[in-house]
Amino acid sequence: MLRAKIFRTALAIAVSLAAAELLPAGEVQETFLSEGVTQRVGGYRPIRGEMDQEASIVTKTPEDLTAPKFGWMEIGEQKWAFVIDEPEEGDARLLVDTNGDGDLTNDPATEWKAREQGEFKTHFGRAQVQLNEEKTGWLGMYRFDPADKRRAQLKNTLMYYPDFGSEYSFELDGQML
């Protein structure tokens, strides 16, 4: 009985593969998505950006920084400097060296907002980064309140994730997939 099931399964696979060889091969098309990928796939895997760098990782910063912390965001071979300015009074700011030139004064503004969560604030936001000469993509990011003792190991960490990617489609049996 088990041998017959295995044989039928193997036969079905062989017939399917043979039939696939008879179908005309369609061209695979890639569409770059600069944002919204995490919503489409239903989640993300955060990456840690430690704020353990010296100010020398950038060449120019806004003059009004009061409590800056510097770090790198890395994805594959690429990396972008960032700074979080968290003054004792006033709102925190996030700056990202989108184009990788070391100048934090010539990049698009980031989105960075605090959300009260009990007695603590968690900051959420996003920023564009230059992937190559033609493409920019969005990174989502968040930072837990450094005063939250439950998350003490993340006290000097920016969590980030790519929200960009590629979608692939091809024609099979007259239908675009």
What positions do the PLM features span?
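Bacterial N-terminal signal peptides
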Residues: 9-21
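N-terminal secretory signal peptides that target proteins for export/translocation
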Residues: 1-5
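Calcium-binding acidic motifs and repeat modules
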Residues: 24-177
